[in-house]
Amino acid sequence: MALQFTLNQDAPASAAVDCIVVGVFADKTLSPAAQALDSASQGRLTALVARGDVASKTGSTTLLHDLPGVTAPRVLVVGLGEAGKFGVAPYLKAVGDATRALKTGAVSTALLTLTELSVKARDAAWNIRQAVTVSDHAAYRYTATLGKKKVDETGLTTLAIAGNDARALAVGVATAEGVEFARELGNLPPNYCTPAYLAETAAAFAGKFPGAEAEILDEAQMEALGMGSLLSVARGSANRPRLIVLKWNGGGDARPYVLVGKGITFDTGGVNLKTQGGIEEMKYDMCGGANVIGTFVATVKAELPINLVVVVPAVENAIDGNAYRPSDVITSMSGKTIEVGNTDAEGRLILCDALTYAERFNPEALVDVATLTGACMVALGHQTAGLMSKHDDLANELLAAGEHVFDRAWRLPLWDEYQGLLDSTFADVYNIGGRWGGAITAGCFLSRFTENQRWAHLDIAGVASDEGKRGMATGRPVGLLTQWLLDRAA
């Protein structure tokens, strides 16, 4: 965890912390805690706001020192924007802005009072949970492979949250731990996070908790199961594949929810080799796997009363003399044959066998998560994941969960009219669908291996990582998936 969290019900003016975080709206209205500090300081805060020394527009932060009558030596005032437009997005932005302002520097402990604000259609428990997940995300530092590079170790370490809902805090912390677990895996270089490492890390976590268990299938076991599609992708790599299976037994005899995550630890594209301007970010192609593992972490930490199974096919798509080729015909675990049109459409080839394997758990619902297509990113950008399902109830559950925690998805069609684009003369199905509608035809491909399941597909290509040299794994959609499971457990 980037931060430690506690609950605090002290009067803001007497809180024994390095800094108190309060808010001010564009019309100069103070948040409840800011009003309390203003009263304790005999109007000092109001005077500073009126004089223009405190900015109130969204995204602004102003650090004040030594307000009279206030125990904390610092007060951070966060701009909340227009009161009439204050809702979920401005609240989350304000929490993140406050945390980033204190991420480095002299402040080690702070009291966040923004949880006292009224957020439209949300309750106090939501305010606390989201404050924890957003602030921990904002305070995250990657250090795993920095070597001798000096890390700034100053700044915020402990954040007290105004409120008294211990369960909300615990669920927020569990979710934040899941997000950070996923981000750490996603950010690791591919020479560190190999299929074996991913499997060992997931199994090590499961081994620490009663009710959690892990099974790791090796190449021989997958071959015995007939996973010819997955193993074809793995042929060109010296890093041999694993199938990671994690189980959380919190729901008695109830049918499990099953999450399947694409775990391509590095994607060269294979024989259809990727080029510079994209290939250097292909360590993030395992973020689907990392994020369902992160959701497992959140579920276990929150001790949700459900049964959950997570399946991650962990494979490296590399190239050597034994690598699979365009025009190969391979046989999947389902028995369906697949003509390879492009070796860079490998994610669906490992997922189809993992989805077939997942049927043995008799899922209540089956959801796969994958950085599957650039086409989804072209269509939807970096703001939302793509969602496909033939089951309206399941799709609506996932969409609602994403809206609730602002980790959103947008539904794309999965109509039968697209299926013809996957026709093959030489096999049961072609692994690509042509130039147009690539995200949808990828979903259509997977639908052929989930025909008897209540299934949905999340294409997270646009949301799993930030772009560019300084980009990092985001941990999305751990928030969406955890909220969906919380809703199922309610």
Curated annotation (Swiss-Prot):
SUPFAM superfamilies per the UniProt record, alphabetical: Macro domain-like (SSF52949), Zn-dependent exopeptidases (SSF53187)
Localization per record: Cytoplasm
GO biological processes: proteolysis
Any one cellular-component term (Gene Ontology): cytoplasm
Cofactor(s) the protein needs: Mn(2+)
Principal location: cytoplasm
Organism: Xanthomonas euvesicatoria pv. vesicatoria (strain 85-10) (Xanthomonas campestris pv. vesicatoria)
Taxonomic superkingdom: Bacteria
Sequence positions that bind Mn(2+) 2: 262, 267, 285, 346
Residues annotated as the enzyme's active site: 274, 348
HAMAP family assigned to the protein according to its UniProt record, in alphabetical order: Cytosol_peptidase_M17
UniProt keyword Cytoplasm, yes or no: yes
InterPro entries: Leucine_aapep/pepB, Macro_dom-like, Peptidase_M17_C, Peptidase_M17_leu_NH2_pept, Peptidase_M17_N
Function: Presumably involved in the processing and regular turnover of intracellular proteins. Catalyzes the removal of unsubstituted N-terminal amino acids from various peptides.
Protein name, entry field: Probable cytosol aminopeptidase
Family: Belongs to the peptidase M17 family.
Gene Ontology MF annotations: manganese ion binding; metalloaminopeptidase activity
